[in-house]
Amino acid sequence: MTDIVDVYLVAAGKYHDIDFARLELLKLLAAHEEIKVTTVSDYENIKEIEKCSFMISYTCDVRPSEGAQSSIRKWVESGGRW
């Protein structure tokens, strides 16, 4: 069995509907049995991000807070992929 790959998907937008893009991304990811996706609307759950191998973001005017930016930067520097 292939190892599970945890993915953190941030899909949200203030000014338009993100549902279509979110669904299409999930369909693409679902083609890979080893991928497990956590889908969220912001960047603030750093503990979950740190558990993941990589993060995908599809957003419109949704930004991480300064604290989340710092934590995400450390996560990327430690090998996390975004």
Where are the language model's segments positioned?
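Aromatic-Pro/Gly-enriched surface loop or interdomain linker
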Residues: M1-S53
